[in-house]
Amino acid sequence: NTATGADHGDLTVQLRQDASNSSYATTDVDACCTGATVAGASSAANAYGSSSTTSTVDAQYEQNSTGAESRATTDVYQYRAYDVTAASTAAANSATINNEWGYTAIRGRQTSSTDVAADARLTVGTWSGVAVVSAYGVGTTTLAPNIGSDMVVDIAQMNTGGVDANAQLNGSSSDGGQVLVSSTAVGNGFT
């Protein structure tokens, strides 16, 4: 995994990432009565992140993922919860190129045959406040926010692996609490 950045300068990136391994992240929480619980797991076979300000960015990257699986699992078991979050994010290939007030040129190639799974489970006896369960799985993704200047984008994505997202809440009662349960599965994504 790679991270770069620039402040009032030029950033030129030529990056290749190849992963033939599986990637796993697991978070397991067993608690009684806490004020707030936030639990999360994140897994990525290949990840590239860049953040720049008032810079010229030329980012060229290639990401190839051929491993069997990228899996993130979050399990929270809690007797009494006041505000509780269980979240999982899993990806085969992920790239984020953020630039503010500077020209950005992006050329990305992302391929994956890796199966991706994001599982988030919350089991709670009773809760108040907010109970949030979120699972997000994506094969290949590029996020490219660019504020205040021009951007040129050339992205090609190919995902042949399966993508699964599962968010689950099991609870017996709420003391006026709110619930948000969300799952998202995406093969290829560009934002």
Question: Which ranges hold each PLM region?
Answer:
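Low-complexity repeat regions of mature extracellularly deployed or surface/particle-associated proteins
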Residues: 1-191
